[in-house]
Amino acid sequence: MAWGLELAADRVRLCRADVRRGRIHLRRATESPVPAGLVRASVKDANVSDPAVLTKVIRGLARRAGCRGWVRVALPDPVFILRTIATEELPEERAAARRFLCWQARDLLPFSAEHARLDFVKAGSGPDGRLRLTCLIANGRILAEYERVLQDADLLPAALDARSVALAQAASGLLAFPSVGLLTADGARATLLVLQEGRPRLWRILATDDGGGGNGVRLIREVADSLAYFQETEDLAPLQHFFVHGMGPRTAEIATGLTQWLELTVSVLDLSQALTSGARPRGLADELTGWGAALGAAIRPW
């Protein structure tokens, strides 16, 4: 049973979980607020304004939870870039393949390819016969910033992943469609993530409507436009289903609006369906909406 930790702009969540008979068994969960402005997600600029303060928050949280040693971590989506890269060949050795793909992606990056950290999954072949690979890329200097904080908090980061990718891992049983979309909110941002055969394929990070009475129309239109663009430029197969997650009181309203715009079945993602039955551990909020990334990090395959 492993530990998963989500580092967000407003709080840190830590849980211990594993998978039993296809469902998540949650053993322990606790969270702590993060001072405003302490974490500002960026792919190229420093993310943590005061590492000592964040270290103190995480160390206290880990001690309360009884967490020591290795932990798998979900970071805000804007720390990462998700791109599909096409190539005629790929080195067989995985480390060599990563270096090769970093070089291939050099013109897509707002930082030097020398500093890139990249992981990838195969996404089949395109119409031109070239191999397609979905790559999750981050600036190694930014990841090292988070790693130092975790190590100073007496934790060992086993893996660093994007929030929405970790959420999709937690909800993998619910997202089991050949091609499925997920819109998940994280404060003032929302990520549109498309998965094919259970694997991340494309994403776009969008701004949510402001808090001044916005009804979600602009966000709904941007989701529809983004999907149309993906289908035109990335050979994206039609979606079979679409899920909405974490939009607060507007979640159901946005799901209804997307049903009308996209003309396909849209559901609200209910993470409780991914968990084993039984009592939830003390320290967990009444509803699970905010815990998807921490859960997904905990059950992430090594």
Show where each model-derived region lies.
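Hydrophobic/aromatic-enriched cytosolic interaction surfaces used to assemble or bind macromolecules
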Residues: 1-302
